[in-house]
Amino acid sequence: PIRSSLDLFFFEVKAVDDQGNIDSTASKLILPIKNSAPEIQFRYRSNPLIANLNSDTSYTFPTRTFIWDSYDQDGNETITDVFYALNDTCDTCWIRLDGNAMSITLKELDIGLNTFFLKCKDIAGASSLTTKFPDSSRPSEAQHWIVKPIMGEILIVDDYPLDNSNNVLSWYSSMMDTLYGDHSYSYWEIGDELPYSATDVSANLNYFKNVFWFAAYNNTASASDTYNGAEASLV
């Protein structure tokens, strides 16, 4: 593989006859090869879409998995390092992963607004462009990412995306307020799609001792039935 920004490759061909005589005027070819920087991007649809969230904000609990694909014209094996950072891209903020890494599950994330940064580097030292989530250059994806705190031991899962005004969630929340008091439970609005990674589904549920999941069967083009997928992630 190319180990510098520009390298020279030498090719030489000699003819040999049946007596073992070697051509003294070998043909030579010198090729200057310029290294290509690697590329990295998030796996298709691995970040939530605004259309599925019915909001421009993605809310998660303190576990979030990011999945990506990397590519190098000189061969993917030349990618030696993947780096990620949270909220700050200072020189010492980056955390290194092996070059063949394709995902990371972050745990115990800071509560509030967060941004995830990602880049990679090849054996010649060339770095990819930095990609991030959220990113305004991808307007179909969520434009804000907020990590919610774990409150109480009860989780209400709102799996009713057609209830845009949240009347059902408000009703169940008022019942929980009456039974257990304010701030004694958490809620999770799924929207039209579960998180891309089943690891995140399991992590969200395992934060709590009791899960109250309400849903409405709809089988329409505008909303999917996500509880089946959630059940599969726990098997």
Give, region by region, the residue ranges found by the protein language model.
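Residues that line or immediately flank small-molecule/substrate-binding pockets and catalytic motifs
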Residues: 86, 158, 215
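Beta-sheet entry/capping signal
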Residues: 81, 153-154, 210
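Residue-level marker of alpha-helix boundaries and capping positions
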Residues: 2, 162-163
